[in-house]
Amino acid sequence: MTVNNEISKAFSKHADDYERVAKVQKEIGSRLFERLQYLKIAPRRILDLGCGPGFFSKELALLYPKAQIVGMDLSFAMLEQARKKQGWRRKWPLVSADMQKMPFATGAFDLVFANQVIHWSSSLGMVFRELNRVMNVNGCLMFTTLGPDTFKELQTAWSAANQYAHVNEFVDMHDIGDCLIAEHFMDPVIDMELLSIHYETLPQLLLALKTQGVRNINPKRNHGLTGKSAWKQFEAQYATMRTTTGKYPLTYEVVYGQAWKGAQRKMEQGIETWIPVSRVVKKS
């Protein structure tokens, strides 16, 4: 089974209840959506990348009533949930595809909204390169992803039990900015915040992650079963991190990103450069 199939299967399994249980992802997306409303843009075509059950596709359609929305997700089951949210007067295409190889024409979108999806890619550079391709000149990319401190409690607790990786690897915000520039995006703005979610019990915490589609795809993960001894060590170590009220904390390092697609200009030597659209001056 490929990594994409693993991810799709994990999300599809919980598609019916995803919007109800994925409160963290919805809150993060709402904060990104709030930032979007401050931008003075009028996109004609919008891609909701990793649209899931379609909550933000619907919000985007309300914010930009004249725009054509396209929802894309790896999971067919998620897209079926998104389809149910569409009114009979206004429907939008729903596409199942890999974000590293999207079935869209070059320059198709003026805005890409990507909430909690790009960290599921095996190559951030390939995702940004493909996004740059499908975006129109002066198009805007708005996204959220996760940083290295995400699930740090899980990392610490499992490190006391065995040498395997139990948490996915997340890219540092500074490296994300560098990657955007390397893939010809202009004026990237990256910032982060830490969110701490508290659970009454450890099983409750782990179940919440499972029902949110969270899956360990780290190449260094244990491909076999975890023994009872390692599990008990994990539980004991996590218990030492409980709050003063006895709850189990779980940290999310949330990274917010915004960038623009600049204009491409060919030099006499055949070398291509990318410049902000604001610097493009038409000759009279």
Swiss-Prot record:
Domain of life of the source: Bacteria
Pathway: Cofactor biosynthesis; biotin biosynthesis
Keywords: Biotin biosynthesis, Methyltransferase, S-adenosyl-L-methionine, Transferase
Catalytic activity: malonyl-[ACP] + S-adenosyl-L-methionine = malonyl-[ACP] methyl ester + S-adenosyl-L-homocysteine
EC number: 2.1.1.197
Gene Ontology biological-process annotations: biotin biosynthetic process; methylation
Keyword Transferase attached: yes
InterPro entries referenced in this protein's UniProt entry, alphabetically: BioC, Malonyl-ACP_OMT, Methyltransf_11, SAM-dependent_MTases_sf
Enzyme class: transferase
A Gene Ontology molecular function term of the record: S-adenosylmethionine-dependent methyltransferase activity
Described purpose of this protein according to its UniProt entry: Converts the free carboxyl group of a malonyl-thioester to its methyl ester by transfer of a methyl group from S-adenosyl-L-methionine (SAM). It allows to synthesize pimeloyl-ACP via the fatty acid synthetic pathway.
NCBIfam families: BioC (TIGR02072)
Record family assignment: Belongs to the methyltransferase superfamily.
Name the record gives this protein: Malonyl-[acyl-carrier protein] O-methyltransferase
Source organism per UniProt: Legionella pneumophila subsp. pneumophila (strain Philadelphia 1 / ATCC 33152 / DSM 7513)
Lineage: Bacteria, Pseudomonadati, Pseudomonadota, Gammaproteobacteria, Legionellales
